[in-house]
Amino acid sequence: MFIIGLTGGIASGKSTVAGILKDLGAIIIDTDRVAREVVAPGRPAYREIVAAFGPRVLRPDGQLDRPALARIIFNDATARELLNAITHPRIRELVQKRLEDLRRANPEAIVVIEAPLLFEAGMEGMVDAVWAVTAPAPVRLKRLMARDKLSLAEAESRLRAQGEETARLRRATRVIPTGGDLEATRASVRAAWQELQRHLADDPEPGGAPWV
């Protein structure tokens, strides 16, 4: 099994790239969905979040109010670190279990872990290659405002909270730009996929080739 860590800043186009990779045959583990499982009512992380942040992060039905929680953590680094400390270990644990299940069921699979905080969550050791998705800041701002119905100031605050992406790009084995149109993104992803397929055909052991 070959595992790709797909990462990138907020509104960089990760989900679009993951969708293209799924169409090409990859199995996707979406850590945002994993996180939703981790913080479901009744789970330990849910109880810790409510204890830490109080009823202001709950909806009337008892579910976490994710937009309310996002407003808090994107404007408070200490709160963000606290939330990450609660959720990241549990997300890692569940992702590792999914990988073990997949390895038994489909040892020849190419698996993509879609994780915006791949490095911050300590998951880089799980993967054979890191593909980083990137787009210019103005493009990301426009996407974020449209997607999450944010003001310009709110969108800028969320981009700032994630910090510079230079370090992330430097640690990646492949960078996929998404600032152009969708067909250009598809072409970049297909090229990366085809190169990976060639490497796997030549040497199926990740440690034996310069993985991309």
Curated annotation (Swiss-Prot):
GO terms for cellular component: cytoplasm. Its main location: cytoplasm. GO terms for biological process: coenzyme A biosynthetic process. ATP binds at A11, S12, G13, K14, S15, T16. InterPro entries: Depp_CoAkinase, P-loop_NTPase. It is found in: Cytoplasm. Pathway: Cofactor biosynthesis; coenzyme A biosynthesis; CoA from (R)-pantothenate: step 5/5. Residues 3-207 form the DPCK domain. Keywords: ATP-binding, Coenzyme A biosynthesis, Cytoplasm, Kinase, Nucleotide-binding, Transferase. The keyword Lipid biosynthesis does not apply. It holds the Pfam family CoaE. It catalyses: 3'-dephospho-CoA + ATP = ADP + CoA + H(+). GO terms for molecular function: ATP binding; dephospho-CoA kinase activity. Its EC number is 2.7.1.24. Catalyzes the phosphorylation of the 3'-hydroxyl group of dephosphocoenzyme A to form coenzyme A. PANTHER family: BIFUNCTIONAL COENZYME A SYNTHASE-RELATED, DEPHOSPHO-COA KINASE-RELATED. Belongs to the CoaE family. This is Dephospho-CoA kinase. It comes from Moorella thermoacetica (strain ATCC 39073 / JCM 9320). The lineage of its organism: Bacteria, Bacillati, Bacillota, Clostridia, Moorellales.
